[in-house]
From Swiss-Prot:
Name of the protein this chain belongs to: Probable pectate lyase P59
Gene Ontology annotations of biological process type: pectin catabolic process
Signal peptide, first to last residue: 1-22
Role played: Might be needed during pollen development and tube growth.
Tissues expressing the protein: Expressed in anthers and pollen.
Cofactor(s) the protein requires to work: Ca(2+)
Cystine residue pairs: none
Gene Ontology molecular function terms on file: metal ion binding; pectate lyase activity
Cofactor: how and how many bound: Binds 1 Ca(2+) ion. Required for its activity.
First-level EC class: lyase
Family (UniProt): Belongs to the polysaccharide lyase 1 family.
Organism encoding this protein: Solanum lycopersicum
Keyword ATP-binding set for record: no
InterPro entries named among the record's database cross-references: AmbAllergen (IPR018082), Pec_lyase (IPR002022), Pec_lyase_N (IPR007524), Pectin_lyas_fold (IPR012334), Pectin_lyase_fold/virulence (IPR011050), PEL (IPR045032)
Length: 449
């Protein structure tokens, strides 16, 4: 009596396992027609938005940056001492003051809460075309519960699985524990300004095969792996997911993504990972602490699809108790500009598979250990190979013995004078000031943020 049942059960397990194996990297347990279509559409979209001359984007970024900084520096002198990031815990209590061009776009407007969608015009860099849910209605999250099979109206998961554009805000501060990874649909803004919203002690946020997303003002911390199972990813689709990695934010084959003013720490895997052909991404004004593998841009040396990856990393503070990967890159083109690296315990910038990484106007403070002063780390390749990769350091500030090992054509700048003259970033000496308000802001409606 037991024999046939055992055989049928074994056959079912074999079929199920065979179905899961090809898509383990995507965490899709059953790669059905919906996911196949999403994947193909996402790949085609990424190919279409790929910037064949990425230096044009860095040029535009730094031109706007320099123009804005000229204006901001006129008032910097009167506030410099009170806005420096100090060693104590005192918070800035003076009048609203912006320190970089992204924040200048919206922050000091006392009516920001009545004009939230102004934020959609403020992105810069490779993610500058991300407008999120600007063309949609507002959705107010009122409930911090989470049902990953049948999300309840008023919850964050219910908001992000809708098919139409939405600008998602929160009625009150809340802690949200996601029982499985929260899989988003395209054309969404998660805007937590004015309240304290924590995604914590559960799974993270997944942006898979979608486009046009803004995430602003979230605390994301203490993220763990999701166990997998049946998870709803749209109002009209639910499917089997394998175990999630435990990333804070996982960007998988997604395009036009802007992550701004987030505070992140202690996730099981990465804080922010961007893989499998993700492109058109800006990560700005973030504050990152207490983590090992901070950011991964490109997950595999064999994933040549990441050649389309183009990412801007700007005005972020990489802070206390970080260890490595700020970021760790493969393939792609990464612009690392005006960030403050005050802590690392292994290295700051790493990579393999010849990514192009342009570092401009950053501050690097090395740890006390004399064996950990180098900012950079190349992996899995001999020097004869990685010396061909374009890793350039321009206008960076190195402190406490920090040093950057460049590679690629040493005459790169002089050979690109038409571009080089326009792409110098703001001075690294100003980075502490420019990143003073990195992380979640303490915004209150009716007052400048």
């Amino acid at each position: 009596m037991g024999g046939p049942k055992i055989k049928y059960s074994f056959l079912f397990l074999c079929i199920t396992f065979a179905t899961i194996i090809p898509s383990l990297m995507a965490h899709i347990g059953h790669y059905d027609e919906v996911w196949r279509r999403r994947a193909e559409e996402a790949k085609e979209y990424a190919r279409n938005i790929y910037e064949p001359h990425p230096e044009n984007v860095t040029l535009a970024f730094n031109q706007k940056l320099r123009d804005t900084m000229k204006e901001l520096k006129k008032v910097k002198g009167t506030h410099n001492n009170s806005t420096r990031r100090g060693l104590g815990t005192k918070k800035y209590t003076g009048p609203c003051m912006v320190t970089n061009p992204i924040d200048k776009c919206w922050r000091c407007d006392p009516n920001w809460a009545d004009n939230r969608k102004k934020l959609a015009d403020c992105a810069m860099g490779f993610g500058s075309k991300a407008i999120g849910g600007k063309d949609g209605e507002f959705y107010v999250v009122t409930d911090n519960s989470d049902d990953y099979n049948d999300p309840k109206p008023g919850t964050l998961r219910h908001a992000v699985i809708q098919k139409e554009p939405l600008w998602i805000i929160f009625k009150r501060g809340m802690n949200i524990r996601l029982h499985q990874e929260m899989i988003m649909q395209s054309d969404k803004t998660i805007d937590a300004r004015g309240v304290n919203v924590h995604i914590t002690k559960g799974a993270g946020i997944t942006l898979q095969y979608i486009k046009n997303v803004i995430i602003h003002g979230l605390h994301i911390h203490d993220i763990v792996e999701g166990n997998g199972g049946m998870v709803r990813d749209a109002v009209d689709h639910i499917g089997i997911r394998t175990k999630s990695d435990g990333d804070g934010i996982s960007i998988f084959g997604a395009s036009y993504i802007w992550i701004d003013h987030v505070s992140m720490q202690r996730c099981y895997d990465g804080l922010i990972d961007a893989v499998e052909g993700s492109t058109g991404i800006t990560i700005s004004n973030g504050h990152f602490t207490d983590h090992n593998e901070v950011m991964l841009f490109g997950a595999s040396d064999s994933s040549s699809i990441d050649q389309v990856m183009q990412i801007t990393l700007a005005f972020n503070h990489f802070g206390k108790r970080l260890i490595q990967r700020m970021p760790r890159c493969r393939w792609g083109y990464i612009h690392v500009v005006n960030n403050d690296y005050t802590h690392w315990n292994m290295y700051a910038i790493g990579g393999s598979m010849h990514p192009t990484i342009i570092h401009q106007g950053n501050r690097f403070i090395a740890p006390p250990d004399i064996f950990k002063k180098q900012v950079t780390k190349r992996e899995y390749n001999p020097e004869s190979v990685w010396m061909q990769w374009t890793w350039r350091s321009e206008g960076n500030l190195f402190m406490n013995g920090a040093y950057f090992t460049e590679s690629g054509d040493p005459e790169w700048s002089s050979k690109h004078k038409d571009l080089y003259d326009g792409i110098s970033a703001a001075p690294a000496e100003d980075v502490t000031w420019m990143t003073r308000f990195a992380g979640v802001l303490g915004c209150k409606p009716g007052k400048p943020c």
